[in-house]
Design a protein with these regions (language model features):
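Extracellular S/T/G-rich loop segment that most often corresponds to the catalytic His/Ser-adjacent loop
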Residues: 270, 382, 403-481, 485, ...
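C-terminal subdomain of the subtilisin-like protease fold in secreted/lumenal serine endopeptidases
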Residues: 348-350, 354-357, 368, 413-417, ...
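Active-site glycine-centered loops adjacent to acidic/histidine catalytic or metal-binding residues
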Residues: 81, 389, 464
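Mature extracellular/periplasmic domains of secretome proteins
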Residues: 63-71, 292-295, 316-319, 335-356, ...
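Subtilisin-like serine protease catalytic core
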Residues: 63-77, 84-99, 103-276, 280-336, ...
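Bacterial Sec-dependent N-terminal signal peptides
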Residues: 1-24
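A cross-family glycoside hydrolase active-site/sugar-binding cleft signature
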Residues: 328, 356-360, 387-388, 419, ...
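Primarily auto-inhibitory N-terminal propeptides
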Residues: 18-54, 60, 65
Length: 549
């Protein structure tokens, strides 16, 4: 499942109003709630905590003070995601191009097993060009798989050979029922928002004699009319926080799809792909449509890493010398282990040095095949960067797959797990939705109100650990661009060692509790720190070049 605005915590990750209203600790928005939230500083994720007093990663400072005049080379970053809009104005010059492939000739020119894979590959599409848009959640698939066998049975009824499957069934059923109830409540809430927005907008449009109501016009209203005054309060709250008719509609559609497809026990779109699904080692299936039916999430992720710097368009990505390889493996729903494994292998085999994975799920029934792909990437020196998830949960206690924890008991040394940080300071520093874990989350990175590319030459703010992961991938790409001799494990070690340390900072621990527990930031990750490219470069400069033989 995508771990940004399209994730399970969709209402947490789209804007401040919805973020505060997505769990039981927050009431539905009422007309009495007129607080206008502060706005994130422009380009804040590229700013520096010391120079700019905001917890960005220091990329602007690094380019200005440490990297001027230094030679660099391009680094390939694979984005395993929903797809990337490769025609976007801020990305079209930053794409990986497979020079061994002649475009659209129907031939696998470079003999890599994939026909016409010019900019990447799509593992959730068919040879006929059709694509999987929606899919079920893994809990739905597992519940459906075992329902007929175990429904209505107690543990005492289960044969010893079936105990493990029965345990999976119980966990999947519990998660399925919890999530259906949660998303149904969220859908009711966003429908309520839509009703309030539309009524207020119609009233104010008539009052102002205009077709489209703007924030400036709303703020300029002075009236004794209580009805108009109440509508003003509502619209000002919505518009000042970036919540428009379009974003409300998007949320309604996303939640509607989750309920319509993600939790339908009878829905299975896999026939579109046309692979032998039970053959987990199968390669070469899919098609070359790297954008797919909805590239919103993947395009946003790609822009954070690589949007062209200094072109006076939209925004600047973290990394300058980078090529984006788009690998489509994540639908609207949960990704499948077979596709994740093949996506990692494709990235490695085709030259990626960094793989960004802004997705995750609570079950991994074919974990072994993903583990083998992770170990393959490790053996080839490829760094894997993974979003920690948006459930406000302790991942030391709950599963978030894929994971660095391998079935053989070893931990992959080419893996970084990333939590999300807000632009706010003090106790509000950690994103309210971010997963955390003293042993499983390595570090935090900016992940709230990140302004980046979206399809069709657009840009928007999104939030999630989905955004924090590509910020970190961008930092890693800067290091490898200027210090190409570094290995994946060295880059990982540098990023961990050079974090901007705030271990004793008191922060609110992400939670659904009415009164969030205040803990030290150091309790939420391995490092108690924020990724920082400025400090990472200084650390990388200490590592000597390997001797030539």
């Amino acid at each position: 499942m995508l771990t940004g605005a399209w994730a399970a915590s969709i209402l947490w990750t789209t804007n401040p109003i919805l973020a505060q209203s997505s769990s039981s600790k927050f009431p539905l928005l009422t007309t009495e709630d007129t607080t206008v939230k502060k706005v994130a500083p422009k380009n804040w994720f590229n700013l520096d905590p010391k120079k700019d007093q905001v917890n960005g990663v220091g990329s602007e400072r690094a380019y200005q003070e440490l990297l001027k005049g230094r030679s660099s080379q391009s680094v390939i970053v694979a984005i395993i995601d929903s797809g990337v809009d490769i025609e976007h104005e801020d990305l079209k010059n930053k794409l990986w191009v497979n020079k061994g492939e002649i475009p659209n000739n129907g031939i696998d020119d470079d003999k890599n097993g994939y026909v016409d894979d010019v900019n990447g590959w799509n593992f959730i599409g068919g040879k006929d060009g059709k694509n999987v848009a929606q899919d079920t959640h893994e809990s739905t698939r597992l519940y459906a798989k075992f329902k007929a066998k175990f429904s209505g049975k107690a543990e005492s009824d289960i044969a010893p050979a079936d105990k493990a499957d029965f345990e999976i069934y119980q966990k999947a059923k519990a998660m399925y029922e919890t999530k259906v109830a949660e998303y149904s409540g969220q859908k009711d809430m966003i429908d309520n928002y839509a009703m309030m927005f539309n009524k207020s907008e119609r009233l104010l449009a008539a009052y102002l004699d205009t077709e489209q109501v703007t924030l400036e016009e709303v703020q300029g209203i002075e009236t004794e009319d209580k009805v108009v005054g109440r509508a003003k309060q509502i619209m000002e709250l919505f518009l000042a926080n970036g919540l428009t008719k379009e974003t409300i509609k998007d949320n309604q559609e996303q939640l509607g799809n989750m309920l319509k497809y993600g939790f339908d026990l009878n829905f299975d779109p896999r026939s579109i792909v046309g692979d032998d699904y039970n053959n987990k080692n199968e390669r070469g299936y899919g098609n070359n449509d790297v954008k797919g039916p909805d590239a919103s999430h993947g395009t946003h992720v790609a822009g954070i890493v690589a949007a062209e710097r200094g072109n006076n368009l939209g925004m600047d990505g973290v990394a300058e010398k980078v090529q984006i390889m788009s690998i489509r493996a994540v639908p609207d729903g949960d990704e499948r282990d077979k596709d994740v494994a093949n996506a990692i292998r494709y990235a490695v085999d085709n030259g990626a040095k960094i793989v960004n994975m802004s997705f995750g799920k609570g079950f991994s029934p074919d974990k072994a095949v993903v583990d083998e792909a992770i170990k393959y990437a490790e053996s080839k020196g490829v760094l894997l960067i993974h979003a920690a998830g948006n459930d406000g949960a302790d991942t030391d206690k709950t599963g978030n797959f894929p994971t660095r924890d391998l079935n053989d008991g070893r931990k992959a040394n080419n893996w970084l797990e990333i939590g999300a940080l807000s632009w706010k300071s003090g106790e509000d520093m950690v994103a309210v939705f971010s997963n955390y874990g003293k042993n499983h989350v390595d570090l935090f990175a900016p992940g709230v109100d990140i302004y980046a590319t979206t399809p069709n030459q657009k840009y928007q703010n999104n939030s999630g650990t989905s955004m924090a992961a590509p910020v970190t991938s961008g930092v890693a790409a800067v290091l490898l661009s200027y210090f190409p001799h570094l290995t994946a494990s060295q880059v990982r070690e540098i990023l961990v060692k050079s974090t901007y340390k705030l271990p004793a900072q008191k922060v609110k621990k992400p939670s659904e509790a009415e009164e969030p527990e205040v803990v030290e930031f150091g309790q939420l990750s391995v490092t108690g720190g924020i990724v920082n490219v400025y400090e990472a470069i200084k650390e990388a400069q200490k590592i000597k070049l390997p001797k030539k033989r």
